[in-house]
């Protein structure tokens, strides 16, 4: 997929207006699907959103960024707080927030339980059960599930 051609196509189909600036992938984006730069008019998109969430979600993110783009160059309110932006975003069925990306490097949690009071503890890191005790009753901790690494 050629990103620039795709954004131009979405702009014409959904907004009826041409997109004439630069578009690029930006791997450094973490918690956002895309960015609009008013200074020079270019757009950045997160490639992980396209790869992991699919074309349908990515198209809605492109619409979101194009809302910023077209409203800015029309001299209307282009920020998230502006009524013009909210109305246009709703009209073109764009996403307000990017869905959470599946995190491939998240470790499964280890689950511990106190043998006396049955209090449960979830931890990312291993607890030395010979050294540490329950914070409520000082009972011994027992590892319930050991996830496969």
UniProtKB/Swiss-Prot annotation:
Cellular compartments annotated: Cytoplasm
Domain SprT-like per the UniProt entry, residue ranges: 4-143
Protein name (Swiss-Prot/TrEMBL): Protein SprT-like
Species in which this protein is naturally found: Streptococcus pneumoniae (strain Taiwan19F-14)
Entry keywords, A to Z: Cytoplasm, Metal-binding, Zinc
InterPro entries to which the protein is assigned, alphabetical: SprT-like_domain, SprT_Zn_ribbon, Uncharacterised_SprT-like
Binding note for cofactor: Binds 1 zinc ion.
GO CC annotation: cytoplasm
Active site annotation, chain numbering: 65
Gene Ontology terms: biological process: response to stress
Cofactor(s) it depends on: Zn(2+)
Pfam families to which the protein is assigned, alphabetical: SprT-like, Zn_ribbon_SprT
MF annotations from Gene Ontology: zinc ion binding
Chain sites annotated for binding Zn(2+): 64, 68
Family, similarity comment: Belongs to the SprT family.
